[in-house]
């Protein structure tokens, strides 16, 4: 099954009535996203061996919140939605969408917001980024989008990605269409931008019990049924791992068929779980999965692979 975004004027009346039965997509709601993430990161840092890094990530998330409101994005995506729908492609496809200079503005604003909070190596990194040319910034963005992590140092990548993610999330929040589930390609990539998930969440509330994968770039969430590998769609050899007990709010879902795993979080166990923060705070579980021979099928926006990984 794949998910395709349909222009509003192309939805039939029956589709409009049933569109909310099981929403295939949950577009980003930016009003409280970054503040909530920053708060969760700070909370998780209290008793975590990676506490300092979680607090560092919280500073970036808070800066994203500030910059979001300082630099709103105005854009009409109607034509792009229509063209993408006709081509069967994600409307904000990271591999073909032209990037404008808005994301450069976001990056420099993030740097300005973060400089007073940074010191030592982190300060040196953002000062180096501040001096980078537009061409250098574009080269780093393009490298990250094709997973060429050897071309972008792992200390620069989170800052570059924070600006790109904010830009793509702003665009995704403006999409004037609905989503429709269709037979076709797999759902391992985001239907809005084509990027990878960071983790998945089994939700509460109006989407009680439904699993949604959370995009690590545009912050969109898309529905994937439970007890099925989100990477290869097989269901015969799935196992669930946790560091605590069977009632843990954060687990790793491993697939013996493709040899990968993805974190799955349960809001019914802890309503405060957050896709990025709780994934980053459970890196010990990642280490365990690596020991068991599984490869991660997702990337956290604050933890990019280094050269040679």
Swiss-Prot record:
Compartment(s): Cytoplasm
Pfam family, one: FdhE_C
Single GO BP term: protein maturation
Key words of the record: Cytoplasm
Secretion signal span: none
Main location: cytoplasm
This protein's record includes keyword Acetylation: no
GO cellular component: cytosol
Gene Ontology MF, one: ferric iron binding
HAMAP family per UniProt: FdeH
Role of this protein: Necessary for formate dehydrogenase activity.
Family: Belongs to the FdhE family.
Protein known as: Protein FdhE homolog
Provenance organism: Klebsiella pneumoniae subsp. pneumoniae (strain ATCC 700721 / MGH 78578)
């Amino acid at each position: 099954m794949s998910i395709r975004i349909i222009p509003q004027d192309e939805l039939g009346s029956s589709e409009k009535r049933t569109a909310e039965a099981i929403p295939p997509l949950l577009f980003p709601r930016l009003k409280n996203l970054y503040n909530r993430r920053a708060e969760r990161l700070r909370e998780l840092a209290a008793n975590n061996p990676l506490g300092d890094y979680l607090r560092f990530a919280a500073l970036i998330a808070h800066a994203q919140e500030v910059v979001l409101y300082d630099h709103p994005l105005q854009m009409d995506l109607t034509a792009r939605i229509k063209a993408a729908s006709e081509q069967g492609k994600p409307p904000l496809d990271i591999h073909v969408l032209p990037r404008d200079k808005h994301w450069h503005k976001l990056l420099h604003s993030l740097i300005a917001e973060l400089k007073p909070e940074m010191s030592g190596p982190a300060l040196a990194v953002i000062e180096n980024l501040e001096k980078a040319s537009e061409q250098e910034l574009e080269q780093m963005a393009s490298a990250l989008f094709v997973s060429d992590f050897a071309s972008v140092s792992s200390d620069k990548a989170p800052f570059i990605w924070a600006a790109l993610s904010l830009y793509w999330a702003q665009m995704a929040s403006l999409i004037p269409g609905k989503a429709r589930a269709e037979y076709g390609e797999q759902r391992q990539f985001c239907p809005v931008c084509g990027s990878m998930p960071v983790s998945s969440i089994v939700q509460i509330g109006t989407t009680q019990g439904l699993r949604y994968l959370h995009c690590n770039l545009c912050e969109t969430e898309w529905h994937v049924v439970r007890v099925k590998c989100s990477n290869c769609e097989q269901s015969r050899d799935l196992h669930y791992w946790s560091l605590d007990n069977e009632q843990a709010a954060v687990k790793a879902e491993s697939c013996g068929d493709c040899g990968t795993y993805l974190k799955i979080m349960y809001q019914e166990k802890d309503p405060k779980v957050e896709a990025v923060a709780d994934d980053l705070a459970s890196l010990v579980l990642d280490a365990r999965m690596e020991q068991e021979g599984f490869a991660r099928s997702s990337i956290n926006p604050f933890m990019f692979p280094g050269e040679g990984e």
